[in-house]
Amino acid sequence: MPDEDLQDILSQISRDNIESTIRKLVSFGTRHTLSSQTDPVRGVGAARTWLTAKFQEAADESEGKMTVDWNSFIKYPGDNERIIFPVNITTIVATLKGSEDPDRYYLTGGHYDSRNSNPIDYQGDAPGAVDDASGVAVSLELARIFAHYKPKSTIVFTAFAGEEQGLLGAQNLAQTYKNASVNLAAMINLDMVGNSKAEDGTTDPHNIRLFCQGTPLTENATTMTSRLSIGGDNDSPARNLGRFIYEVASNVWTEMTVRVIYRLDRYSRGGDHRPFLEAGYTGVRFVQPNEDYTQQHQNVTVRNGKQYGDLTQWLDFEYNTRAAKVVATTMWSLANAPASPTNVGINTTMSDNFSQFKWDAPKGLPVEGYEILYRETIEPHWTNVIDVGNVTWYNLTSATIHKDNVIFGVRSVGKGGYKSPAVLPFPFGCARNC
């Protein structure tokens, strides 16, 4: 059951606010990256100005805990056919400082730019209602609500720019964080979370997909070889983050089930989580359960009696609100748990029926204990939990829970029962009583 603060947060998520934000973003006509940055009513500049003011309204209610900044740079033509003249790319970043572990960050957000059928048409209408005003609306609504609370770790709410031109805003922010050695523990991308209907009319209003990369994109050859040798390719940080989100956010409070997809993204598609993965961070992407491709990246037109275009009329605002509850639960649960244990290992130097684990306590929030999780290798989610207390090693002496037959994970447990994502143990060699 969510704690009292989280229950209160969930009760405040407003369908009307989410709808209002989406309609306002659509009203700018186009939010194409190359569109006007000076017109006060049309184009990406007008959208940026309005969004910045709305995030600042949230910050003004935070008693100084939240700050709003721009992460900006100039993108020049040359290596990107979708950039045909120099353009300013500005991501809006609202940072809510953690009350106890402010150096550990969790980030969520969507992209506020849009496009139509032609990726360099910066003058034609590109309403971008689902893609991705729906995700930005969630980020803004959660910033508004969370500003009144004190999560223990830092939460960042973003509106990315330049996504449709090649994930440009996310790439720059990820590199900015990497250059500053920011401890970003997870990035949660919200890209198309506003409609549950497919092109054939199929609807799935209580499910949301979560795309989770396998073997990390930046993993070195030695670690990758070890991961593959122990069958750990399905237990990357991103996939264990996905299991965490499934566990905390699939419930009656959100009225949703998180459907974890073991892929980086959909076929031939990309999202703002990828640059964070490429920078060495853990990132995942929420996407609605079904898609209608007559509504994505389409000119607003009618052909053979059928309406095309990413219009507000296709939105299911109740679904969008439930998606916001999933994200709120995810961010609150991550930010109030201790960090995951580090240097998690399992002794494989001897052929025996015992499983000997060791790990290091994480920095930041105090840990009240640890749990060893396990599941059959064919199971998608954790099925069993062993509470091992507040120790940094454990000998599992059960011959029926054999390390050759299951996948293990170790997670931290903190105050209030908040738990970290699990970590896959890698093989190590040590003395019997290490």
From Swiss-Prot:
Its cofactor is Zn(2+). Its EC number is 3.4.-.-. The keyword Secreted applies. It is an enzyme of class 3 (hydrolase). GO terms for molecular function: metal ion binding; metalloexopeptidase activity. GO terms for biological process: proteolysis. It is found in: Secreted. Residues 340-433 form the Fibronectin type-III domain. Binds 2 Zn(2+) ions per subunit. The keyword Zinc applies. InterPro entries: FN3_dom (IPR003961), FN3_sf (IPR036116), Ig-like_fold (IPR013783), M28_fam (IPR045175), Peptidase_M28 (IPR007484). Transmembrane segments: none annotated. Its main location: secreted. Keywords: Glycoprotein, Hydrolase, Metal-binding, Metalloprotease, Protease, Secreted, Signal, Zinc. Zn(2+) 2 binds at D131, E164. Zn(2+) 1 binds at H111, D131, D191. GO terms for cellular component: extracellular region. Glycans are attached at N88, N179, N220, N299, N347, N353, N390, N395. Belongs to the peptidase M28 family. M28B subfamily. This is Probable zinc metalloprotease PTRG_04772.
